[in-house]
Amino acid sequence: MERNLQKQLYGISRESSPGARRYSMPAASADSTRKSIFGGSASCAQMSGSLKRTALTNSRLSLSVRSTQSIAGIRSDYNSVESFGCPLPVVVNEALTFAGPGAGTVTAKVTQNGWAWVVQGRRLLIWQYKDTAKSGSPPRVGKLARRGGGLAQCRELTLPYSDLGHKSDLISVFQTEGQQMASCIAVSATGEVRYWSSIAHDGNSVDLSILTGQEFVQLLSLPTQQGYLAVTTTCNLVFLRVGLTNGRYTLHHKTIKPATSFLGGFGKKFASILIGMNTGADKDQTLVGMCCESNLESGETIVAVLSDRAIQRWSLSNNGNTENLLYEDADMLRRIREEFITNFWKFRLPADSLEIDLHLLDFHVVKNKAYILAGAVNAAHAPQMCYALVTGTAQAERMLLESFTPLNMNKFFSAKTEEDCLSVRFVVGSSHIYLYTSKVVYPLHLTNSVPTAELEAEKIEFHQHDDRILSAVICSQLPLFFSRTHGLVSITPGDFDGTEMMNMSSCNTPDLYAPNSCNASFAVADHSALTNSTNNLHLFELDPDEMYNELSDEVGQLKAAFLYHMKRNSNMVKTIVDELLRNVTAADPSGAPMDAYKLDRIVITIAEDLAEDIPIADPRWEEALADQEMNRHAIGSSRSMQIINQLRDKIIAFQHFITFLHSSLVWDKLNVIPCGSHSLKPTGCILADISEKIVAAMALRSIQTKLPKLIEEAIDATVALWHEEPQGSLTYQDIFYVKLSRFQNVFEALADIADDRIAAQNQTTISVAHFVNEINSIVLDVLGQVFKYRKQHASSFRLSHEKLPSYENLPWTAMAGSAGVRDTLTRLIDISVRYGSHCVSETELKQQLYQQIFELIDLVLDGRKTYLKSVRDTEKFNVLQQQFEAQRRELISVLIKDRQYEYAAKIAEKYLDFQSLVLICDETQDKERLEDYTRKYEEYDFSQFAINWHLRQNRHGEVFERFKGNQTALAQFMRDHPSLGWIQLIFNGDFERAAKVLYELAQCETEFVARKKSMLSLAKLAAFAAAESDLTAQVEKINADLTLVEYQSQLGHDVLESFGFDPAEQKVLKAEEIISLYIAEENETASETEFRKALELLSYVEQPYDMRHKIWCAAIKRDNWTDYDPNNAVHYMQKLLFYKIIEISQLMGNDSENVLPPMEDFLESVELGDLPQQKPFQYLLKLTYEYVADMFKQPDDMEL
């Protein structure tokens, strides 16, 4: 791939080889090619003067040696295509590879919440491809995404009947908090709606018919409104909501009134004129797509609907009851049409003769920015469809077109190829837009949320004949594509490595340190230290004129401007900076694409050099350096021989450099740097990380005199880990306090030392606990100074308000892996608990360890919470929030298990872990504390959380005991859980109402017969307890229902299993179903007793006459009525099941007229086939009836 195309696709330079700096900088300056604050291989940072490597490097291997082909049948030269998640369920594979009629109508969808489904005819196959509760963090997603060996469990549902078939876009699968099994709602194209409260039970569904005569094409979930929005091909909207009435789910719908703007009603005739369409005045508008644009603080949701006529923006209230059309903008489409003409045909044909056909293909809204994929054909010029990506933002009264990006992927357009030309779709990721057809994916790079793909992108081809892409989604910033042949696959640029981000000191995931203003003040700096250190700083001795003349590259020029700033020569500063800004924004003379991050790379290069510059006056370093000239222009060097003074000089020089960036207005031009293939890190945050590592080094050096042996051992282990060896008279400490790029590794070394000391002990002793205490104190002291510095100097690294919402905030102290400290902190917590606090009895030491554990937990959670706040409006927020909540609960539980309730409560209160707070109140039996939390966290609905917690613990009774003083909370709880309202009635002594509520709940119960029996039994008890009321009639109804339940319980397990029922957890069966199971052919052991029970159940059937006939026919078919000895007909008859049923009925005192149907019913029965026409059957049947008539005669009526 050519370099300009590489830059176009990935927004980075690939000009340097592994180990070299990837800044596209000239190497004229020796000091600009020396070392990196972001680490890398030690072999790339030796004192031999080899080029250094930075975190802006996006791979350890060049593209020429990196394999990107992962799956046979998918061709990609520069991207890695890997299988994602578990293998597809077998039944899904069978549906996808189905080759019969209708195979081409199979559709599929993959969603961000981890669920996927396939639609084949009326079959809906649902499975969970990713467990969002256990997914890994995004930096590790490259490793976690690889396919495991287990199969995902698939659920099959039956869709409602539809003449127009079913589409996967009209289905939504979701799982709410506390719900064990997902729910599903489906809308057919003809408007038949079906809702399943649990996808595990196909038969338990609710149906509704809406807006007949229309064709529905898309279903949109509205979480705020707890509903759904269905849209037809003509942009008619229907709001759907699932309700719960008396414990039974119901569906409700509301048709959104159509727009009455100038494009609605009679104004439709003018729409085509206004936007230039030649499609006929009477043609209805056609839907392109519908998106949930934003959720406002008021609870309202903004929905955007794009058609081929206009774009509508609707506002829906938080309860979905009211809607408001904000506006309908047709001018947006006119502007898109004009952009096509301007960019593709303006210079080829006279503008007056241009008539183009505009096609809007796909529509998405991401972070309040609208993305539209459009195509246009100028038939008069050439039968070719041209494509473009359009971005826009919503204004108060119209849509603002922000950008129009032509795409060089033209297709031949004809009647035969029209479907293929119009099939292009796209998904929007954090750093790329992925265009795709059924066979090809085009990854296009995003810069500031705008596509920059004017060149043709690389094609990722799914080239197997029977393969095609069925769906695509962005999940946790990872693009996933659902292939008919390969299932779910992920696509990442070929230079991406899931572990690489973890190995880079400050480029893990996008982060954002989020202060409020841009003020370059270092007001809290120690001015006395500044004065005292001035004589040691080498930068005051450097001649700016000499540097300006000698170093002609951009790095050298900006260094010179910095020195002029220190000399207060503002004219030269302005001259150099202006020229530099012109150069970095000018077009490349060779025609290569402009490097959008060039200025950021220059600034970070200088900051890295400053942080790792060696002390210029130390003769030991002169001896170690092969090239003495490479340190001559070092602006971070100190003349001091003491390490602590060298570090202080560096932080002062760094502060001067940041002040220079602000005063020269260079800071306002800084943006971001690509870190890995999917991450953009703000330059201001990278600079903050660099300065904080200098401060951390100062803090460690300051306490080294207190614990010299331990810290020296950790430093030696850290430098050895870097594969560095001191040369000449240099020591490990000299190297460590210069190589600050990987300073965080010293914390890992301290944890390793603790493990080694523990492993060396035969048993845990108090000395180990003291040792762990010392290590914790080092870590906490150092990080305490870092956080203090971060707070004091936040304004110096603050981003502008415009850039603030665009980036994420993940400081190095919160990063996982070797790039940060978070994993080490978690490890120290575990060590402190297992080998510290649990193993000592000394009160003071034990309390010190718990205090340290408390502080370590606070550091871990604070970093994760800060990061979580910065990604609130991104795709990965839900996944990261679940991870945060899981780790929060796990860490606080450590303190709760050890009964450190006060520490646990402080953490839980700070990070709003309500589950831990309720658990603390429960274990301490502190009812007052629970009431205090209810008042304190009223805005978070703490009382409802606490009540639900008790329910999950199966402690229903305690809810009313503990919250009886909070009637408001109980009332709200009863409204949300109507199936438990009877408990409060019991507590209040209202047994009559409790009996009625329980009986109503039992009538609504259709899932588990055991639950229905319990409800009926409780209702009967409540009725008996209502001594003052006469509930005889209700008790009789209850007894009748209990009798029906008892009949069901007597069914054999074999017959239940043969019909697919679970004998252990039986669902509620109707009387007709129970009868059918009693008399079924599969019930081979059924005797006259089972058939008698079936007859007894006729009183529960709406049409008993027909069912009685069915029972007797089933009994007749059990025996042979034609092959018998006529001489012994009576004897043979008495062995028939038919006769035995009559006989047992007679013994039980039943009248034959009520038991037996008329004989003519059997002689004319269709169910018996040709048996009634056979004479032997007729004879034996008539004999039976005659014999039975005599048997049922009363003794007084018999003649002697």
UniProtKB/Swiss-Prot annotation:
Record's subunit section: Forms part of the Nup107-Nup160 subcomplex in the nuclear pore.
Gene: Nup133
Pfam families noted in UniProt: Nucleoporin_N
Source species: Drosophila melanogaster
Free-text function comment from the UniProt entry: Probable component of the nuclear pore complex (NPC). Plays a role in NPC assembly and/or maintenance.
MF terms in GO: structural constituent of nuclear pore
InterPro entries for the chain: Nucleoporin_Nup133/Nup155_N (IPR014908), Nup133-like (IPR037624), WD40/YVTN_repeat-like_dom_sf (IPR015943)
GO terms classed as biological process: mRNA export from nucleus; poly(A)+ mRNA export from nucleus; protein import into nucleus; transcription-dependent tethering of RNA polymerase II gene DNA at nuclear periphery
GO cellular component term of the entry, any: nuclear pore outer ring
Region (Disordered): 1-28
Keyword tags: mRNA transport, Nuclear pore complex, Nucleus, Protein transport, Translocation, Transport
Membership in a protein family: Belongs to the nucleoporin Nup133 family.
Annotated compartments: Nucleus, Nuclear pore complex
Annotated protein name in UniProt: Nuclear pore complex protein Nup133
